[in-house]
């Protein structure tokens, strides 16, 4: 035993304590650390010592004698002849107690590992349940939203129904009011009543009707009664032989006077006629003949023109009133000698007044001017006095138009008098004109549709006709497109193929596909095998080979396999309807047979043989080849060099269709749609019932999660149990039962086994759990047997306590060495008080709080302060955990108040544990002392949130040993090294250690203003106080004569640059071979030359001079950037910009960057500027840009100048433009502006293909000279006003005046040059303002629209519509750079017209050599990339001389070797498709830098072999 330590004066100070790695595996109770240290010194570098350290448990007999156990085998390390000897031993010289202790420790470690595995499995299950809860919650929310939408629709329909009912009633009322006696229905009723009244009157008053005697004989006479019925008051015929007047009078005299009877009989006879005359009267022969003669005479007089024209007029008339007027006017027109064909058209489409005026003129009484004037006056009076649906202005306009048409018609009449149209020509012309009129009226008609929600949509039928014609033309020219070389897009069939593998004859692999109820592949893939292994979407199964299908005149066969039951959902291919030369696509797997890839190209089909230019590889045999419709065309069997050889199977399966019992993708989609629609139509009650079921299931899942969390916590708490019935308490010898026999006993019940299977445990994991449980049960059983008759229980308990404490320390150290990620995934039990807070919502907040021993109460108090009782809203989660030596508290779903947590991010507090044994009369007492020390800066940073109490406050007076330890130098903490490989996050760029660090991406807005800096801003640093530095000196140094000198400010800045940058790191590279470029140097002439761009030309007032083109360009810009509408002005403190840039004048006098200024003074000046009313003018600071330029420009001092303002003004502009700029950056693939675009990962190819589609085959490249400086102020301010228009009304109302002031400062600048001159510039877009590129894009967009509208006007005489312009013109623009494609039929582009237009209208400079026309994108350039298409994809070729010049004459020094390596890799990426010599040169330099880095021990990232190709 070691002594208690020195206590008296002159005692030797204790030696610094250093914990040895591997101490956890030792079980010797005394002097472990010193023995291990001496053992390492003696054997640390030998192989025997390394193998000993690989054992599970190590026992130190002495420095030269060690035992170890691994599994069930013991090993011994001794010294033989001065050398360590490590060997296995079957019977080690150990006591049973020592063996039991080593076995117990080994078992405890095994149980600890299994517990960790079980804990991880449970936590994974918890995460899955949480995901399921989240999915159900989302589904519940979607269902509720759907119900709300249905309710809104039902309410809208109800309201619409009510509106329609009210409208119907109103229409009925109006209809009743309009029904008058002059209506057609009333007129018919009136005629009916008149007819009835006439009949009744005639019946009452009688008539002059009488009989007519027919000159025919009759054998009998009629009596008086018969005569009276036939002849009195009736028109009838009576045979002359049957009439006897005297006998009739005598018979009548019986009733009345004889003379009266004779008179009545005489009056009843009207006359006498022959039999032929009777027939003519009965059949109305005379009337019919007269009618026929009249018609014939009319036809002969008027020909057939009049009736035909009248007939068509009546057909085309709009109502009955118009029909009557038209018929009358036609008759008058015929009488007046007017031509009936034009008169018919006038009657049909012109007002009736126009036709009447033409008839009046035809009478010959009024001249043309007079009738025209009267016609116009009449129509105007009608427009004013007679109400109509149209506006009065529209009606007056119509009156004027038809008044102009009237003399034109009359003149046409007069001209037609000199010609004669035959009857047949009139008929044909009339029919054609009427038919065309009907068709035109139908096409131009407007259709109104009322939606169920009440919205009304209108469209014209002519648009549908255009769409139909476009569809027909698309189908008609589809084959032509293929011939022209345009590769079509193919449907994705990535899920339709499977991987087939066989083990016969060394094994082979290929691709299979489903056709009907079988899977097919190439015959040589399966060979003679009977069983094949099929893999689809990670699912693997066995399938029988049913046979081979012989292919006619082909060397290979087509193998047919059955479909395994798990693969019933494998999509089915559909056969192509025809096979002909066209573009095809082959679907297969990559070289590793992991990911699906495709090959596309032109296929030549010769009979059943198919050849395509696919450079395939082993493993692609059996791949399906599809046509442009996604239908199965053929099968790939192999390749010859770069030509794929396949077989067309359309005719093979034509007689025996393969698709019999399966459903196609379209049928399945239709069925799914029908099911979805059926589910939508269920009633509200059913939806409510479903919601209740989902809520119950959600609650049940939440309960399961809570139970699992509790189980997890209980499992972790069990690690602290200190009982002899555990692994840590086992130290006794075994009894008479066989361990092998016990391990065969049953541990899990059937219910427990099934529950583990349902929870996702595999058979191997269940077996490990069972083995661990059995091991635990076996040890417990041994403990129970040894407890009987055991008297020395106190010493055993003390020994158990010591072993348990040692194991706890080892477990705690191992858990702490797992890294930061472990605390975020598990709630770990600690011996000291520890808090962990995580809240995920709009932003992620994580905090860890650690307390030394003795401060558990304070930990609980802080926990109660941070965790509130408020529940988090939906979509946010939080977890809080408190770990104490005797309990664990966990809370989830509550809002956490982080203001009680004070973070110290620059300090690391480590814990070192020291155990001292003090010898006292009352016995041995184990004391623990924990000190909190500050770790070195190179150690990883751990967040510490509550200041740690001083250790002196927790020490007790009766512990002098601990106080002495406190005064010694702090021991260096032993930490487990992180052995994982370094990785770089692709999202945020942060480097972390794999498998050790739990990486959380940082926010991409890394340039947010820092907090702090509350020192008041002195007046001499404010942006609007620059005038105090200006002296009234008229000293002209570089400013041209036509610009004023406002004063002079004395500043100490570089004016001329004559030396180039010297970078020592570049000395280790070979000098590149490049010429024509260099880094910039300049003299004072460069400042003078920078003013030339403002004086190239003056713009005209294009708004007044070209109003139509201006309106067209405005409409085009609005259509393109309409996504900016509804943006907001953000607070200035939320803006983001580069804070390491110059703070401009006057802040640059005291600070090198904006960051320094903000750290000192904060953002109060920024906020005051945004909230106040501004009327002053900021000062703009100018300096020349150091970059790589052409040697000619450098020699001519043609250097670009940067103009920037105070960062307060810059951030003010950012508050106005940030949201709009972000929206533009998000739409580079679908819109013109390319701010934030990338050419990599196919980005350049997608954009070039987009702009050259839809017939836009002509490519135009245009580059302005001095674009920023020559932009007209009127145009620039117009774009700024357009951006203001896109803001919300609230933002415009609140910040409108401030925005107007800011916009004015952009083009009216007080400018300070490095020479100290202060001048006034009133033109151009300053290159240092926040939105320079975005504003240039808008100007570019506007000018392009104006340019093509101008060209179209020159070619066709009209300005195109915005729709036609956008359909025929598409382009990419980045600032002043533009690549455009247009349809050649749209404009016949003339470069000289464009040059003259920009110079004469806008005062802008376009050089003739900067306008280039191409028939294809090849050779054109955009953003420094010259477009080429080497492998079917558009890539960019750069100017390697300019890029490599940065390695020869750099513009700035590189900070370290890693930066040089990164620059070389970046240059190789850019030059990959350019000069091969440049790529080879860069590869050699990269290799040289990597060799140097390895020699210096510098770790560089690894770049794969295909990195440079795949990134494009």
UniProtKB/Swiss-Prot annotation:
**Mind telling me which GO cellular component terms the entry cites?**
host cell membrane; membrane
The record's listing under PROSITE patterns reads:
RDRP_SSRNA_POS
* Sites marked Cleavage: 204-205, 478-479, 717-718, 730-731, 809-810, 954-955
Name the residue ranges with Low complexity bias.
941-961
Keyword Transferase found: yes
Instruction: List the catalytic activities from the record.
Output: RNA(n) + a ribonucleoside 5'-triphosphate = RNA(n+1) + diphosphate
The UniProt keyword set, sorted, is:
ATP-binding, Covalent protein-RNA linkage, Host membrane, Hydrolase, Membrane, Nucleotide-binding, Nucleotidyltransferase, Phosphoprotein, Protease, RNA-directed RNA polymerase, Serine protease, Transferase, Transmembrane, Transmembrane helix, Viral RNA replication
Q: Which Pfam families does this chain map to?
A: Astro_VPg (PF19416), RdRP_1 (PF00680)
Q: What is the originating organism of this protein? A: Avian nephritis virus 1 (ANV-1)
Segments spanning the bilayer are 190-210, 295-315, 323-343, 360-380, 399-419
Q: Which positions are catalytic residues?
A: 524, 556, 621
* Assigned EC number: 3.4.21.-, 2.7.7.48
What GO terms are given for molecular function? ATP binding; RNA binding; RNA-directed RNA polymerase activity; serine-type peptidase activity
According to the entry, every stretch annotated as the RdRp catalytic domain falls at 1257-1390
Q: Can you name this protein?
A: Non-structural polyprotein 1AB
**Region listing for Disordered, in residue ranges:** 940-981
List GO BP terms, alphabetically.
DNA-templated transcription; proteolysis; viral RNA genome replication; viral translational frameshifting
User: Disulfide connectivity?
Assistant: none
Q: Matching InterPro entries, A to Z? A: Astro_VPg, DNA/RNA_pol_sf, Peptidase_S1_PA, Peptidase_S1_PA_chymotrypsin, Rev_trsase/Diguanyl_cyclase, RNA-dir_pol_C, RNA-dir_pol_PSvirus
Which family is it part of? Belongs to the astroviridae polyprotein 1AB family.
PTM note says: Cleaved by the viral and host proteases. The protease is probably autocatalytically cleaved.
PTM annotation (O-(5'-phospho-RNA)-tyrosine): residues: 753
